[in-house]
């Protein structure tokens, strides 16, 4: 067994519906942590696969209870049609995936160990976040306001993959009545 896989009964990425891969239907997310200085601090990242819309999640700690509760809080703010699935790596912070699914109705799928290419949207977005917060950043010293500003800048940045629309415009166009 892989020593990095403390996840009990993971649902593997191979079991995701085909629509997740095609990105035709919004509501499928990729999640991760961006670790700070000495791996002691972190922020959570949630990226919607179709629109590339980003939610940066401030974290006081990176244990599974803290991460689950913080991610649940963010998913509760979303309309039901944007809460279809979450694809994650095998980090211990998602050990409470069954509780997360029970509380949010969002099914969690796990990438294969050591396979970051299975979550390309999230890996790319984490790279963009590193433009603002390079490796060695102590996220405990970064305010929620600063995180929100970076989130907004990235969500307002036009993306080639979205035909030079921004993630915010793309998600807003899809859900005109929803307040993000």
Task: Annotate each PLM feature.
Residues 56, 84-88:
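Short catalytic-loop micro-motif centered on adjacent basic/acidic residues
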Residues 34, 38-55, 71:
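Short conserved beta-strand segments at catalytic cores or DNA/RNA-binding microdomains
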Residues 30, 46, 87:
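Generic enzyme active-site microenvironment
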Residues 38-39, 56-80:
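Active-site beta-loop-alpha junctions of metal-dependent nucleic acid enzymes
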Residues 135-180:
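C-terminal domain-tail junction helix/linker
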Residues 52-57, 110, 135-137:
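Short small-residue beta-strand/loop micro-motif enriched in glycine and branched aliphatics
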Residues 1-43:
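Mobile-element integrase/transposase regions
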């Amino acid at each position: 067994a892989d020593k990095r896989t403390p996840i009990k009964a993971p649902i593997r990425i191979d079991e995701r519906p085909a629509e997740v891969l095609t990105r035709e239907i919004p509501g499928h997310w990729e999640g991760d942590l961006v670790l700070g200085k000495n791996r002691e601090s972190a922020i959570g990242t949630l990226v919607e696969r179709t629109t590339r819309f980003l939610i940066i999640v401030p974290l006081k700690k990176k244990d599974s209870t803290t991460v689950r509760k913080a991610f649940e809080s963010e998913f509760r703010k979303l309309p039901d049609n944007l809460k279809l699935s979450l694809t994650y790596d095998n980090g211990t912070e998602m050990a409470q995936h069954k509780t997360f699914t029970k509380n949010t109705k969002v099914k969690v799928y796990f990438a294969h160990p050591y396979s970051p290419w299975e979550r390309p949207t999230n890996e790319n977005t984490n790279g963009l976040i590193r433009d603002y917060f390079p490796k060695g950043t102590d996220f405990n010293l970064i305010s929620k306001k600063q995180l929100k500003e970076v989130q907004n800048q990235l969500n307002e940045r036009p993306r080639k993959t979205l035909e030079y629309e921004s993630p915010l415009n793309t998600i807003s166009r899809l859900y005109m009545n929803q307040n993000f």
